[in-house]
Amino acid sequence: MLVVIPQVLNAEQVGAVRERLEHAGEAWVDGRVTAGYSGAPVKFNQQIDERSDVALECQRLILGMLERNPRFISAALPNIVYPPMFNRYSEGMTFGAHVDGSVRIHPHDGRKLRTDISATLFLSPHDSYDGGELQVQDTYGMHSVKLDAGDMVVYPATSLHQVTPITRGTRVASFFWIQSLIRDDTQRSLLFDMDNAIQRLNQTGADEEARRTLVGCYHNLLRQWSET
């Protein structure tokens, strides 16, 4: 399930993050330092040292906004969110086809995190660069994603994906992973559809007893499938 989440950050917040990243100096490092053995040969970008002060400051802002975003909560059903990381692609940079590693070590507390969901939060205006599309492969084909600054996409971390070469400008983004309460993507998709249907029924004033029954079914499925 690939889900677009608009306006995770507003224009002012995007500007604040971008300003901090643009003045990060030596905190920008070769992106291959965190790549696995299969990703390193095809990864050509820069990223912020995830333990740097600028990373910690930007992480707090993004995590705070995610906690208050109903669409993110509904789609991801997050259990643990890996602290957001930040990358930069200039002209000629790319990240070839790869699958994200299955387990990450939390940089702040050492916990192991299962990467159920991958997330990319775009921080550059979509018309400020050419190329740089996030391409995600699933059973229905290839999906090309290029969103405006402040918008985010989440998709199964099991997906083969890539970032196409930059031919003009610079693409800055945040990326991270989520260990969901529901590890199975099909089950998450079903619960996401149910939650959306419930919200629409609430807006239309549909039969209250029927809505309560549907809400009960949602929570009973969540109770049956979730891992905490």
From Swiss-Prot:
InterPro entries: Oxoglu/Fe-dep_dioxygenase_dom, PKHD_C, PKHD_hydroxylase, Pro_4_hyd_alph, Pro_4_hyd_alph_FE2OG_OXY. Residues 80-180 form the Fe2OG dioxygenase domain. One of its GO terms (biological process) is intracellular iron ion homeostasis. 2-oxoglutarate binds at R171. Pfam families: 2OG-FeII_Oxy_3, PKHD_C. Its cofactor is Fe(2+); L-ascorbate. Keywords: Dioxygenase, Iron, Metal-binding, Oxidoreductase, Vitamin C. Fe cation binds at H98, D100, H161. Its EC number is 1.14.11.-. Gene3D superfamilies: q2cbj1_9rhob like domain, Rabenosyn, Rab binding domain. PROSITE patterns: FE2OG_OXY. It is an enzyme of class 1 (oxidoreductase). GO terms for molecular function: 2-oxoglutarate-dependent dioxygenase activity; iron ion binding; L-ascorbic acid binding. Disulfide bonds: none annotated. Binds 1 Fe(2+) ion per subunit. HAMAP family: Hydroxyl_YbiX. NCBIfam families: PRK05467.1-3, PRK05467.1-4. This is PKHD-type hydroxylase Reut_A2877.
